[in-house]
Amino acid sequence: MVKAIRKLSLIQKIMIGIVIGTTLGFLVPEWTFISVLGELFVGALKAIAPILVFVLIIASLAQQKAGAKTYVGSILVVYLLATFLAAVVAVTASYLFPVKIVLEAAQEAQAAPTQLSDVLSNVLTSVVQNPIQAMIEGNYLSVLFWSSLIGIGLRQSSVATKDVIANLSTGITTVVQMIIGIAPIGILGLVFHSVATTGIAGLAKYGQLLLLLIGTMAVVALVVYPAIVFWNIRQNPYPLVFFVLKESAIPAFFTRSSAANIPINMELAKAMDLNEESYAVSIPLGATINMGGAAITITIMTLAAVHTLGMSVPIYLALLLSIIAAVSACGASGIAGGSLLLIPLACSLFGISNDIAMQVVGVGFIVGVVQDSIETALNSSSDLLFTTSVELADRRKNGEIIDVKALIGKSQLVVEQENI
């Protein structure tokens, strides 16, 4: 029995954990101790992720030779473009399928930013936070900033110093692999908690809104993002898209944390033999900047409020909303509460009062059980998707023959061997 389980791939083990967690959640919801398994798993990932990012970036930059090629600039452009396109799709979907919501008493929440300048100020200020405090709080903009400076500063250090840093990086990567190995048990606990505390009835009231959110994110994940990948690699993007959805989006869906999924994306990038000097920066950066799912949430929730209030929206204002949603979504990870607390900012564009906007936020918390999971899955998996596609595009331009299916097959073999 044990040997048979060990032969299963990590994703197969996770699916078994999902089934067991769902079953126990329905049958014995009072067994709350099972939820602790999920809390421990997510806590471990969140704890190790900032350290992993900090050390990996220092190690890669310290050993980087002058003039070495990286793809971070190109990946950043793709991140921003993808986030904007996601917002445009959300606006289009909201016009085609207008949804109204019941606005009841406003739910108490933390103060949300009321101006775009507040979001930008928050992001820029967070960059220069104390690096130790940044790792404790999971502030990846600051972690990226300081680790990059330290890594560049260590380029002139001795070979022995660089070897110590490289060995430390290897050791932390091994710890990450150990934590990822217990993902099936952790996800079992997460699924149990979700089913036991919420169930199906709690979400039925907001079915139309949920369907619009889920449908829009599905279109972006299966149509818009593959189109961007096709433009880069000039071949069928879906083998890569489905590989990333299976290996990265599923864990992200259940952890509901882009930060917790960074180590998983790092391991997958390593398995695909990507440029470490690029992905060590682009994947943590994507957890902060690549926020297509957040842009969709902000846009759809805002326009749902607009439709509920019977307001008419001219096309230029809808386009402006797309831009604001895309820009503010990039700061969602720097604000407690994520994308939901940026809804009042978007609502202010239409003159909607803060009281009503906070009611919309309250609805967001209710549907967030599903919405937040899918949003995180879309955001985090696309970090790996775009990082891979941009590097493959550069290889193609340099005359290298790109075989995506062979690359995926090789990486799947590496992932399965590491998790046996």
UniProtKB/Swiss-Prot annotation:
The chain crosses the membrane at residues 14-34, 40-60, 71-91, 172-192, 210-230, 283-303, 309-329, 332-352, 356-376. GO terms for biological process: serine transport; threonine transport. GO terms for molecular function: neutral L-amino acid:sodium symporter activity. Keywords: Amino-acid transport, Cell membrane, Membrane, Symport, Transmembrane, Transmembrane helix, Transport. It catalyses: L-serine(in) + Na(+)(in) = L-serine(out) + Na(+)(out); L-threonine(in) + Na(+)(in) = L-threonine(out) + Na(+)(out). It is found in: Cell membrane. It is a multi-pass membrane protein. One of its GO terms (cellular component) is plasma membrane. Involved in the import of serine and threonine into the cell, with the concomitant import of sodium (symport system). NCBIfam families: PRK13628.1 (NF010151). HAMAP family: Ser_Thr_transp_SstT (MF_01582). Belongs to the dicarboxylate/amino acid:cation symporter (DAACS) (TC 2.A.23) family. This is Serine/threonine transporter SstT. The lineage of its organism: Bacteria, Bacillati, Bacillota, Bacilli, Lactobacillales.
